């Protein structure tokens, strides 16, 4: 019987948070090995665990997987969150990559110099309000179904709902003008596995505060 997946990263959101969300949505329990020092990262590098000397890394099914997209695609395939055919998978990839583009801006925001944060936040809000959220609202309106692809939960829905939560932390109410996105967020949030993940005390990480940023810098810089 294989053990639980083990996630290797620091104790913050970063590039691991979408993986945590997807595993949680799939109802998969996982363990975390938090890097606390540069030496912790060096040990993973020296023992050959990191193909490109980078985290996140996930131990699952006897493999040590790196590269966020590869990890997400494996989990999505394994737990039937990746569509029923090539066409659906292409759409899921397209929607998920759009999410990743904006999520990357959100991810970098806490790590930016103080003098650049105001402009960065304004850019995130503008891109969310005028480019990304309208695009996903249009998709949901075009087919009138509950989920983005195939009327079934996929990794694209999970990543989009995660993004909605993260952007709303920065600008409460930004989703209010997108009723179908709000409905999707409610629908996904009420799934038992996700509802559990959204409760206090879960493995979901809070916004990267100054302490988290300093910890990450000590490990990776």
Curated annotation (Swiss-Prot):
Induction: By ethoxyquin, oltipraz, butylated hydroxyanisole, and phenobarbitol.
The name this protein goes by in its record: Glutathione S-transferase alpha-5
Top EC class of this enzyme: transferase
Primary gene name: Gsta5
UniProt keyword Amino-acid biosynthesis present: no
Keyword check for Disulfide bond: no
Source species of the chain: Rattus norvegicus (Rat)
UniProt-listed CDD domains: GST_C_Alpha, GST_N_Alpha
GO BP annotation list: glutathione metabolic process; response to bacterium; response to stilbenoid; xenobiotic metabolic process
Tissues in which the protein is found: Liver, nasal mucosa and epididymis.
Job description of the protein: Conjugation of reduced glutathione to a wide number of exogenous and endogenous hydrophobic electrophiles. Has substantial activity toward aflatoxin B1-8,9-epoxide.
């Amino acid at each position: 019987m294989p053990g639980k997946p083990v996630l290797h990263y620091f104790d913050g959101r970063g590039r691991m948070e979408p993986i945590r969300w997807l595993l949680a949505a799939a109802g998969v329990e996982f363990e975390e090995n938090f890097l606390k020092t540069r030496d912790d990262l060096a040990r993973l590098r020296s023992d050959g665990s990191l193909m490109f000397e980078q985290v996140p890394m996930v131990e699952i099914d006897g493999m040590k997987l790196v590269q966020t997209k590869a990890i997400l695609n494996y989990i999505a395939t394994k737990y039937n969150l990746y569509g029923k055919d090539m066409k659906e998978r292409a759409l899921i990839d397209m929607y998920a990559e759009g999410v990743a583009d904006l999520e990357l801006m959100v991810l970098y925001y806490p790590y930016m110099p103080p003098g650049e944060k105001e402009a960065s936040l304004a850019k995130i809000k503008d891109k969310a309000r005028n480019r990304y959220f309208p695009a996903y609202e249009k998709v949901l309106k075009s087919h009138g179904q509950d989920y983005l692809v195939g009327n079934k939960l996929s990794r694209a829905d999970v990543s989009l709902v995660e993004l909605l939560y993260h952007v709303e932390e920065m600008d409460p109410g930004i989703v209010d003008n997108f009723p179908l996105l709000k409905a999707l967020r409610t629908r996904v949030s009420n799934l038992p596995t996700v509802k559990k993940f959204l409760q206090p005390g879960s493995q979901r990480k809070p916004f990267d505060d100054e302490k988290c940023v300093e910890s990450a810098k000590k490990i990776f810089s």
